[in-house]
Regions:
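Acidic Gly/Asp/Thr-rich repetitive segments characteristic of extracellular carbohydrate-active
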Residues: 38-83
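Residues in short coils/turns that link rungs of repeat/solenoid architectures in beta-rich domains
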Residues: 114, 140, 173, 200, ...
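C-terminal functional modules
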Residues: 338-449
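Bacterial N-terminal signal peptides
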Residues: 14-25
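Detector for repetitive beta-architecture
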Residues: 57, 80-82, 88-90, 97, ...
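N-terminal secretory signal peptides that target proteins for export/translocation
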Residues: 1-10
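Right-handed parallel beta-helix
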Residues: 92-235
Length: 449
């Protein structure tokens, strides 16, 4: 498990008046000043976002795409809010993206009755701050549309989004990226303003990011992509995720992007796994910003669709500072013959190797790469305690070394058709500050057949 564990609270000293005064002067002040975590095990710069804590409870009571009691009504509402589910099954968004524009939101997919909530034919765009999304499945797919007719991310942020966590979600079949942090490249007058106005303080943890559709409906053609971290996006943490069957971008950092990629399992990438690319044409008239990447304790395993590649590649025209340490990179038979770094550019770029390890992001307990595969497989996805058939198949592909990059969800069984289920949400059964069940276990049901 990648979730951290916190020490027991400080015990007061009782030996004499001086010790008692010392305890009052120090320990209680530290405890009072410590901000609450978004949820137990939250990591990164966004770990202390309140999300919707203290706001109204908004119940999703229908699987309809919109209207009273719908998911759309809940997430597009105003004010601090915690979205809970009294219905399980499939929500069809009709090839539309929902835009979250109001801050202080927690989406608690873990509250849904078995088999949980799966959103199909659509995705989420986060255009605000202090948002926590947990335990959802989002599977956009091609919707039966003709090729080159459009594109949808499963989840993405846009310019100005900050303090966002996407944790324990299953994101597949996107026709743009499965999970991205996007932005406007140059919003402001200088690099400091570009950074401040970009998406920032983002944590993507413990997600399945898989099967981006390749030759599908994206206008550019091939577009099986894992995660795009856009130009100038910063303070990003990508930790404990499973990237499987994506042709590229597991993840891609664009020009000037800065963040850490830690303890992820990347299986069956196509022509690129992790890469960095500042595209000169997009930066015309602007000075180049240097990118920064920390890449530690990750695993990359080649699969059927993997082409000749290096684990970490640099393209384009901008320089990159990188600290890479303890990354395990193997081919299909377990040989460590794949090189760690490479390039797909002839521009005079510099890959500057940082010698001293940067500080780990808040809450991260770094695992050695040799332990990452088992830890990720055990913990990853929307409902690791009872995965749906699609997640089970993807995880089985990783375990067995099979599967390939796909062009349509129809190649792997198509959209799910789970029956609607219902269960009232009872406030008293949950710790509403962190949206964890007081019983210690999430809703379960009979295994899906």
């Amino acid at each position: 498990m990648l979730d951290i564990r916190f020490p027991a609270r400080v015990r007061g000293l009782t030996c004499g008046l001086a010790a008692l005064l010392m305890a009052f002067a120090t320990a209680p002040v530290l405890a009072a000043d410590a901000p609450a975590l978004a949820f137990p095990g939250a990591q990164g710069a966004a770990a202390h976002t309140p999300g919707g804590r203290g706001g109204k409870i908004v119940r999703v009571t229908t699987l309809a795409a919109d209207g009273p009691g719908s998911f759309k009504e809940a997430v597009t509402g105003k004010g601090p809010r915690i979205v809970v589910f009294e219905v399980g099954g499939v929500i069809d968004l009709g090839m539309k993206e929902l835009r979250i524009s109001e801050p202080f939101l927690t989406i608690a997919g873990q509250t849904a009755p078995h088999p949980g909530v799966t959103i199909i034919k659509g995705g989420l765009t986060i255009a605000t701050h202090d948002v926590v999304i947990r335990h959802l499945r989002i599977r956009p797919g091609d919707g039966g549309l003709p090729k080159r007719s459009g594109d949808i991310d499963a989840i993405t942020t846009v310019r100005g989004a900050h303090d966002v966590i996407v944790d324990h979600c299953s994101l597949t079949w996107a026709t743009d990226e499965n999970l991205s942090a996007s932005s406007t490249r140059f919003h402001g007058e200088n690099e400091a303003e570009w950074m401040a106005n970009a998406s920032r303080r983002i944590t993507y943890s413990n997600n399945i990011v898989s099967e981006g559709l390749a030759d599908s409906i994206h206008a550019k053609g091939e577009h099986s992509k894992g995660s795009l971290i856009h130009d100038h996006v910063n303070e990003v943490l990508i930790v404990g995720n499973l990237y499987a069957h994506n042709y590229e971008r597991s993840p891609l950092f664009k020009g000037g992007a800065r963040g850490q990629v830690i303890n992820n399992l990347i299986y069956n990438p196509g022509q690129r796994a992790i890469h960095y690319n500042l595209i000169a044409e997009e930066w015309r008239g602007h000075p180049y910003s240097k990118g920064e990447m920390v890449v530690r304790g990750n695993v990359m395993r080649a699969g059927k669709s993997t082409e000749p590649l290096a684990f970490l590649m640099i393209g384009g025209s901008g320089d990159l500072d990188v600290y890479a340490q303890d990354n395990l990179i193997v081919d299909r038979v377990g040989k460590t013959s794949i090189q760690e770094t490479g390039s797909y550019t002839t521009a005079p770029v510099k890959l500057n190797r940082v010698k001293n390890a940067p500080a780990l992001p808040f809450g991260v307990s770094l695992l050695p790469a040799a332990k990452v595969q088992d830890a990720v497989i055990e913990n990853v996805g929307a409902t690791p305690w009872n995965r749906d058939l699609i997640d089970r198949r993807i995880v089985a592909d990783v375990i067995e070394g099979r599967g390939e990059i796909i062009d349509s969800q129809d190649q792997v069984g198509g959209y799910p058709q789970y029956k609607e289920t219902r269960k009232l949400f009872v406030d008293s059964e949950w710790n509403l500050d962190v949206m964890e069940p007081k019983s210690g276990s999430y809703p379960r049901g009979e295994p899906l057949r």
